[in-house]
Amino acid sequence: MKRIWFAVVALSAVLLFGGNQTSHAQQGMIDLSQWTPPDIGVVGDDPFGKLVKYGHELFTNTANEIGPAVADVSKRLAGNNLACQNCHLHAGTQPYAMPLTGVWGQFPQYRAREGMVEILEERINGCMERSVNGRALALQSREMRAFSSYLRWLSTGVPDGAKLLGAGTLQDQGAGTAG
């Protein structure tokens, strides 16, 4: 009888505690392929909304806004005609295509390439200098505030530090290569 009682108690503990570990892990996971990004069309015209809209414009039309042929020489911050969304598809919302949904809550983070912990604005400048062959943005510039406001807005509803299924690329996920 003691063996049966022990087995019932042990099985109950495994089901109670072991099952919760799985559900807790799943609760912290967000599948970006099932995620609906916020709608840029409903962003307000308050100061934050204006920065979000400008950030979206910078992100989707980088060369037209800050590229090498912009009429205002002081705005020539990017050194080529790429747009941010050439790498981060669909304005940074496409799963498995280096999406930026939820990235706001992933920083600061350790960056192996730089060998240090970076804030989001430093990572943005990494893209500015390497990917678009441009100049680093001043941390308090309108452009930097717009980029970071856009990324903050894009992360609306994603808990800080959430595990994001679909972040990175297909190759990063071990699911093959991006096609």
Regions found by a protein language model. Give the residues of each.
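Short cysteine/histidine-rich metal-coordination sites, predominantly Zn2+-binding motifs
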Residues: 74-75, 100-109
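The canonical Cys-X-X-Cys-His
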Residues: 55, 81-92, 147, 179
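Short, solvent-exposed loop/turn and secondary-structure capping segments
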Residues: 69-70, 94-101, 159-163
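Local sequence-structure signature of Cys/Sec-based thiol-disulfide redox active-site neighborhoods
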Residues: 69-81
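Post-cleavage N-terminal segment of exported redox proteins
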Residues: 2-66, 109-178
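Helix-coil boundary and N-terminal low-complexity module in membrane systems
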Residues: 62-65, 80, 91, 97-102
